[in-house]
C-alpha cells in the first residue's frame, strides 16, 4: 500500500477526483464567488471540494490537496493593475512544486483594467501536462447575472471533467 502511494506521489498522479477552490478576496466579492462555485459543485454531486482562502491558510496545506485532487480553481482580484500579490505568491509555489497533470480553471475579479487574468493565463501556460477546464472570465467587482451564468457554466464543465 505504501509503495503504491509512493509511485502515485513520485509520478504526480491524481490520487482521487476532487476540486480545490483557492481564492484571494479583498472586499468579499471574490470570496462570495468562490463560495457559490463550491455550493454549485456540491449540489451537482461533487464529493471532494476544498475551499481555501489564500490570505488565511498556509500554502503547505493547500499544496498537499492540490496534489491529492484532480482540479484546481483559482479566483483572484486585480491589485495595482496586476494579480493580487498573495495569488502571485501561490502561483510561484505551484511553480516551485512542479504543478502538473491537473485540470485548472481561472476567474479574475476587477473593477477597472488590470492584468490579473492574463497573468494567471500566462503562468498556467508554462505548466506542463495541465488542462484548462471552462472558459476563464472576469467578474466586474461583484457577481451579476452574466458572471453568475459564467459561474454556472464553469461548474458544469468542472463536473464533466470529473467523470
How would you name each of these model-derived features?
Residues 18-26:
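Cytosolic transmitter module of two-component histidine kinases
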Residues 1, 5-18, 36-54, 62-163:
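FMN-binding flavodoxin-like domain, especially the glycine-rich phosphate-binding loop
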